[in-house]
Amino acid sequence: MSDTTKPPMARKMGLTAERVHGERRVEDPSRSVMTPPKEELRANVKDLSFWYGEFQALHAVNLPIARNKVTALIGASGCGKSTLLRCFNRMHDLYPGNRYGGEIDLQPEGQNIIAPGIDPILIRLRIGMVFQKPNPFPKTIYENVASGLRIRGIRSRAVLDERVEVSLRQAALWDEVKDRLHQSAYGLSGGQQQRLCIARTLAPNPEIILFDEPTSALDPIATAKIEDLFTDLRDDYTIVIVTHNMQQAARISDYLAFMHLGKMIEFGPTDECFVKPKHAMTEEYITGRFG
């Protein structure tokens, strides 16, 4: 098979026909293939199920999240990856009738964050989230970043100033906005607004950051700037990202989780999943032959 006849993703990832098709794969869609991380875990999803009312969206999902690594969730639309992501910070609690089963344990303490009696507000301070479209508050740039700190009870102007600057620097935005901190956030470009939302998420110093397709509404230049952040952010944070972009998943993630119809199909190191997937459905998806 020549390069021009390989599936587009196989060409993009440099996969050869022998490496993609040369070994027997697991074909049973009811079976998942897991290659656990060698690193210490920051969170551990155990037999997680989730229902929107009577509809079951997740089926006994297991997913280990390695500390200070980027884990990418991939799969076709409707596979449950965004549903899974929003379980981590209890976003589903905002709508009546939704319910969980199983566990999401934060490590090392082993606290099940979806257990009854756990305050979701406290969970969201520990697990931040950046959404698909930039959603700055109708406030100044400064107040967008400081808002989460004020919720935590921080009132010292010196502390607020320091955390705002540090967070904007972490989001690679400080040099672009340092002279207009007290102007409206709506005056920023789309890419700048998304980096502002990242800074806002970083300010309270969360343990885990969730990204739900954070670059899907941005142009390639803005996308590249945000992707560049992941290398630095993983030094201090554990990251879980949902993406439809296979190239992006390959560029930025350490671990890959492929989902289908609310089930975990395969999880393992990103390079292994792309170069040598162990499940036939994973191979079909990443080589563009899925469905």
Curated annotation (Swiss-Prot):
Record localization: Cell inner membrane
PROSITE patterns for the chain: ABC_TRANSPORTER_1 (PS00211), ABC_TRANSPORTER_2 (PS50893), PSTB (PS51238)
An MF annotation (GO) of this entry: ATP binding
SMART domains named in the record: AAA
Binding site for ATP: G75, A76, S77, G78, C79, G80, K81, S82
Family annotation (Pfam families): ABC_tran
Membrane topology: Peripheral membrane protein
Keywords: ATP-binding, Cell inner membrane, Cell membrane, Membrane, Nucleotide-binding, Phosphate transport, Translocase, Transport
GO cellular component: plasma membrane
Described purpose of this protein according to its UniProt entry: Part of the ABC transporter complex PstSACB involved in phosphate import. Responsible for energy coupling to the transport system.
Name of the protein in its database record: Phosphate import ATP-binding protein PstB
Source organism (scientific name): Alcaligenes faecalis
UniProt lineage: Bacteria, Pseudomonadati, Pseudomonadota, Betaproteobacteria, Burkholderiales
